[in-house]
């Protein structure tokens, strides 16, 4: 394992605060989607918060393993799940953007770009057509 102390700290911080970070990320996401409350209904916010909490856990695991593909693959899998429920795949990209913005704003040590390569890998993977 090639994890640096900074990556180890960031992964632990994400795990410890994933529920709160997921809530903030979901709030950002809902600001980006016109009519999100109507589209996703009464339990929509909580469903997205739970889903983004799981994505943040995947990011923490990817950080610990120093494996960008691990996070990218999780986001591609998530897109498959979301689109199977007839939800626009674009919302997954917006969710990824919202998580990145939230982590950069909320976590110490992430403004140096240390998590960017994980998000960049996920963006690249999501740009590929779904199979």
PLM ranges: what are they?
Residues 1-93, 97, 102-131:
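Core of compact, soluble alpha-helical bundle domains
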């Amino acid at each position: 394992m090639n994890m640096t102390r900074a990556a180890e700290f960031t992964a632990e911080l994400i795990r410890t605060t994933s529920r709160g970070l997921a809530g903030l990320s979901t709030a950002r996401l809902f600001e980006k989607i016109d009519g999100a409350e109507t589209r996703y209904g009464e339990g929509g916010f909580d469903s997205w918060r739970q889903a983004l909490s799981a994505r943040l856990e995947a990011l923490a695991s990817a950080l610990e393993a120093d494996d960008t593909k691990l996070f990218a693959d999780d986001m591609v899998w998530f897109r498959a799940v979301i689109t199977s429920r007839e939800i626009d795949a674009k919302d997954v990209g917006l969710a990824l953007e919202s998580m990145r913005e939230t982590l950069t704003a909320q976590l110490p040590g992430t403004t140096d770009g240390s998590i960017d390569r994980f998000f960049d890998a996920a963006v690249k993977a999501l740009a590929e057509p779904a199979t």
